[in-house]
Amino acid sequence: MEITQVIYVNDHNNIEANLTGQEEMNTTMEIESSSVPQSKNYKKWLRISIYVFFVLACQALSTILGRVYYENGGKSTWMGTLVQLIGFPVLFLFRFFSQTKNPKPTEADFRKFSSFTILGSVYIVTGLLVSANSYMSSVGLLYLPVSTFSLILASQLAFTAFFSYFLNSQKFTPFIVNSLFLLTISSALLVVNTDSENTAKVSRVKYVIGIICTIGASAGIGLLLSLVQLILRKVLKKQTFSTVTDLVAYQSLVASCVVLIGLFASGEWKTLTSEMENYKLGKVPYVMTLASIAISWQVYTIGVVGLIFESSSVFSNSITAVGLPIVPVVAVIVFHDKMNASKIFSIILAIWGFISFVYQHYLDEKKLKTSHTSPVGDPHLLPAEEGHTNIHSV
C-alpha cells in the first residue's frame, strides 16, 4: 500500500511538472503564433490592396488609352481588339510565381480530365466568345464617347444576373431586381437620348452601330461570366487558382489567334504601317500606346484573378463594379466629354444599381460563411466544411 502511494505521489508530481512545462510551452507557442498570423494578415491585406489598385487603375487606364489610340489617328478595330488579348503570356508568369509560394499539391490536384477534347472545347468556346466581346467593345469605343461607352458597358452586371438565372439558378432577390432595373434604365437613357451627344466626329449610323456593339459586348461579357461559372462547376469540377488562371490564359490565347486571323483576313494589316507613320503623336507614342493598352489589360486581369484567390469571386466582382463609374469621370477630365443632365442622372442610377448589386452579394457571402461555420467542439466537421470554399490554392 505504501509502495502504491509512493508511486502515485511520484506520478502526481511528474504530472504537475509535465503540466507546468506544457503550460510554459503553450504560452510560448501562443506568443509566437499570435505574431505569425498577424504578420501573415498584414501581408494578405497588402496583396489585396495591390490587386484592388490593379483593377481600379488599369480598368480606367486601358479604356482611356484605347480612346487615345482612336483619337490620334488609330483606325484599326482589329488592332484595338488584339492589344486587349495579346498580353496573355503575363498570366502564365503570374501563375508560376504565385505557385512557388503555395504548398505542394496533393494527389487530388493532379486529377486527369476525362477527355482533353472537353478541355480543348472549353478553351475554344470561351475564346471565341472573348474575341467577339473584345471586337464589339473596340467598335463601340471607336464610335462612342468614352463616358457613354463605359456607362452602357456597365449593364454587364444586369446581363450577368440575367444569364446566371438560367445557367446557374441565380435567385432574383429584391436587390438584384432593383439592380437590373436601375442599370437597364441607366443604359436606356443614353440610348434614347442620342440627340444630346456631340456626334460631329461620327455619322448617325456609326453612332448607332457603336451603341449596338457596346450593348452586344455587355451582353457577351455577362454570358461569358455566367458560362465560366457553369464550366468550373459542372465541367472542370474544380475551382482552384491554377484552374481559373489557366482558363483565362488559354481562352485569351484562342481569342488572340482568332483576332489575328481577322486582322489579316480583313486586310487591315496592310494599313498599319501608314497608320503608325501618320499617328498624330508620332511613331514611338503609337507603339507605346498599344503596348500600354496590352499591359494594362493583363495587369487588370491579374488583379481580378488575384482578388478571387486572396478573397472571393464576389469581392472581385464587387471591386470591378465599383470601378466602372470611375471611367466616365476620367473621360470628362481627359477628353472633355459632354456631361449633360441625362448622363449625370445615368451615372447616379448606375452607382445606385452597383450598390444594390454589391450589397446582395455581400449578403450572399455572409450567409454562406454563416452556414459553413462548424459547431464548437466538433472538429470532425472542419474538413467537410472547408471543401465548400470556392477557390483553393494549388
From Swiss-Prot:
Any single GO CC term annotated in Swiss-Prot or TrEMBL for this entry: membrane
Transmembrane segments annotated in the record for this chain: 45-65, 77-97, 113-133, 139-159, 172-192, 208-228, 247-267, 289-309, 315-335, 344-364
Claim: Ubl conjugation is one of the keywords in the record: no
UniProt-recorded Gene Ontology molecular function terms: purine nucleobase transmembrane transporter activity; purine nucleoside transmembrane transporter activity
GO biological process, one term: purine nucleobase transport
Main subcellular localisation: membrane
Residue numbers spanned by region Disordered: 373-394
Cellular location(s): Membrane
Origin: domain of life: Eukaryota
Key words of the record: Membrane, Transmembrane, Transmembrane helix, Transport
Membrane topology summary: Multi-pass membrane protein
Family: Belongs to the purine permeases (TC 2.A.7.14) family.
PANTHER family: OS09G0467300 PROTEIN-RELATED, PURINE PERMEASE 22-RELATED
Protein name per the record: Probable purine permease 8
Organism of origin: Arabidopsis thaliana (Mouse-ear cress)
Gene encoding the protein: PUP8
